[in-house]
Amino acid sequence: MGAMKPPSRKSCYNFRVTKINRVIDGDTIDVTLDLGFSLTKKERVRIAGVDTPEKRTRDKEEKTLGIDATNWMKEKLTETIKGDEELVIRTELVGGVGKYGRLLGWLYVGDATLSLNEQMITEGYAWAYDGGTKQKNFEELREIRRSFGSLVES
């Protein structure tokens, strides 16, 4: 299955993130959004178009890859906080909420044209996901990460 496509800048809602409260796992984060007029809102965000391995599982292989995906997201968001770049969440959905009540969005840092969502897939930390059946091909992720030199094998 192919990945969902990120919304174009013209057809979406943009939310500026003022604070990253917590990285739950590789595809879910808690943030504080700027709503304008000095109003903010805490929101749980499901990172659109991706599925990462679970870090809370009995499967050791999946758990290791899930922790790696979570750490990758933490690192990217930490870099954003330390720099002068702004983190923006884009969503096409009216209200932006997916089937589990979380904001469903694409994460963009500064003026980047490639979202963090797409980078996760490209660098082998997540599979493309369009809402259908989830895949669990761990070898595919390991191969991509080997090609990037980011896989530490035990």
Task: State where each predicted segment sits.
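Small beta-barrel nucleic-acid-binding modules, primarily SNase/OB-fold domains
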Residues: 1-154
